[in-house]
Amino acid sequence: AGSAMAAVRAVEIDPEGTFKYILVRLQRPGGGEQRDIVRGTKAAEFHNHIFEKVNPEMEKLGYECKCLGGGKIEHNSKDKKIRVFGLSTGYGKADHSVTVEILKKEYTDYEITWSDDKK
């Protein structure tokens, strides 16, 4: 079962631009293993649009999802920079420092920063 959760991609974000993101906790029903994943896209007008897409996908795999909060990601692939900032009106502010740690594992050669700035 452990490998199934490991198979879920930790990060799925747009390759370029500024867009909303959410931090989602996956958990096996009844506790047990859990992990946090980052999802973000320009296609989402609101943070809950991202959650409404990821939640059924994860439920199919047998996980419960909880949104830990949201914010924005500014992804500059040319300069290899990612900035995490802002918050979600509906879900509150994600712990951006957690998000950055997850992003650093995927984008190893990037400069990744975060702040509580709104813009």
What are these regions (language model features)?
Residues 1-119:
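Intrinsic low-complexity, intrinsically disordered or marginally ordered coil/linker segments
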